[in-house]
């Protein structure tokens, strides 16, 4: 039988997405198709329209067929009182299974990848996983940090304060080609959307990336000759800018934003060449005022942060805004449970209001909360806050998303989401 035509938007309202983190949900879905099917039915029944399936966690290995990336074989999982390795026992195509089961219940499917990552250093003496740790010949792909004691590869940072994802250098052409191929492989699937997460510089922020590759590219970009690297740009160990950034620093920040801008443009074009119907988008933190430290300008190029008083922005920083290369955008409105309403950053409503202002109609966007890790959310018990969280975000943007499914399940927030979506749908004109 032919599938029923989709209801027009005025009957279904704006899209409502739930994020399904690969690592956090691994134990439930790595080898249980029935559980995937049952949970997707429940997701649909409470009123979500879309799922976002993470298929490349921070180790950089993948849960779909790729010509260049290795299949994900294990993740570190918190069990009882410590982290343990859990190995994948399922042999089915994880992403294809989500697509198949979602189609049966009428959910749209978006796949997300962690973009500029290539490995993960685990706490509790578990060791590490990922391409960068397995292939020593690719150490030059990893970020180089401008640390207090000198330049150092993130692969040489092994202290307890350095646990977590190992980032790749976004300016490295080999890295870009590798990640682009992963994205092209993903675009071969029957997806509604592809979303880039962590399409940015390292978690070390302003300390990244000071490799020889980045130095050479910066000199080419800026016309500045760096004779005393990295001090030409920043003193060793710099983690924050003073109130007045110098011209070279501003040019450096512009350069980093141009690196990410050009990659997003390239990735968007690559996806649309393979399948023009796949929507291309990104996840970013909605805290624009400080997101420059990640090398990202997610705004419209029509928005000028310099004219808006941001002291770190050069005259050309606005040209690195990449909103016009995206079909949709997810803004992490990750405010605390008691910071739902407001007009500024670090309120959910304020994040979304600012998003609309900065994106200038270039792209549809939606904001949403992190209901497991943000202030006030970490211990559950916040079901009463969910309907307002939905209302604050969905009315200011073009949809709503929530991170993460595992928290809905852990804290049994299903009924709260159903109430929030039902309340919203009552306001939609029939």
What are the residue ranges of the model-derived segments?
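Bacterial Sec-dependent N-terminal signal peptides
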Residues: 1-11
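Active-site-adjacent "subsite" loops/lids of carbohydrate-active enzymes
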Residues: 10-33, 111-189, 245-246
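Hydrophobic faces of well-ordered beta-strands that scaffold small-molecule active sites
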Residues: 16-20, 51-53, 109-111, 194-197, ...
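Short, acidic/polar
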Residues: 26-44, 173-185, 302-324, 348, ...
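Catalytic domains of carbohydrate-active enzymes, especially glycoside hydrolases
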Residues: 34-61, 189-193, 318-331, 393-400
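Aromatic-lined carbohydrate-binding/catalytic grooves of carbohydrate-active enzymes
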Residues: 48-90
């Amino acid at each position: 039988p032919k599938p029923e035509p989709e209801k027009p938007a005025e009957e279904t309202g704006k899209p409502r997405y739930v994020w399904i983190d690969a690592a956090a949900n691994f134990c439930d879905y790595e080898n249980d198709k029935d559980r995937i099917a049952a949970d997707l039915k429940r997701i649909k029944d409470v009123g979500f329209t879309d799922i976002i399936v993470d298929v490349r966690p921070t180790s950089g290995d993948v849960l779909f067929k790729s010509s260049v990336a290795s299949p994900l074989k294990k993740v570190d999982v918190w069990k009882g009182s410590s982290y343990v390795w859990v190995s994948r026992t399922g042999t089915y195509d994880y992403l294809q299974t989500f697509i198949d089961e979602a189609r049966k219940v009428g959910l749209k499917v978006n796949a997300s990848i962690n973009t500029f990552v290539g490995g993960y250093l685990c706490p509790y003496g578990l060791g590490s996983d990922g391409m960068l740790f397995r292939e020593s010949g690719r150490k030059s792909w990893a970020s180089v940090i401008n640390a207090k004691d000198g330049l150092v590869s993130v692969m040489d940072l092994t202290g307890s304060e350095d646990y977590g994802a190992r980032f790749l250098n976004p300016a490295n052409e080999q890295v870009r080609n590798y990640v682009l191929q992963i994205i092209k492989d993903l675009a071969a699937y029957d997806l509604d959307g592809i979303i880039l997460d962590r399409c940015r510089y390292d978690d070390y922020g302003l300390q990244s990336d000071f490799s020889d590759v980045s130095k050479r590219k910066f000199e080419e970009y800026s016309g500045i000759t760096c004779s005393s690297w990295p001090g030409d740009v920043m003193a060793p160990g710099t983690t924050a800018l003073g109130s007045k950034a110098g011209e070279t620093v501003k040019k450096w920040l512009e350069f980093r934003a141009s690196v990410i801008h050009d990659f997003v443009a390239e990735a968007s074009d690559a996806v649309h060449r393979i399948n023009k119907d796949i929507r291309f988008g990104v996840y970013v933190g909605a805290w624009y005022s400080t997101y420059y430290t990640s090398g990202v300008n997610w705004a419209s190029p029509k928005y000028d942060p310099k004219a808006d008083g941001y002291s770190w922005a050069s005259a050309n920083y606005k040209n690195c805004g990449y909103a016009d290369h995206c079909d949709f955008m997810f803004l992490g409105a990750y405010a605390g449970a008691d910071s739902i309403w407001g007009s500024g950053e670090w309120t959910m409503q304020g994040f979304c209001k600012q998003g609309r202002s900065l994106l200038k109609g270039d792209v549809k966007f939606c904001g949403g909360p992190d209901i497991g890790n943000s202030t006030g959310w970490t211990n559950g018990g916040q079901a009463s806050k969910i309907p307002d969280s939905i209302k604050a975000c969905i009315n200011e943007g073009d949809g709503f998303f929530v991170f993460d499914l595992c928290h809905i399940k852990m804290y049994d927030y299903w009924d709260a989401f159903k109430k929030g979506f039902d309340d919203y749908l009552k306001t939609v004109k029939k």
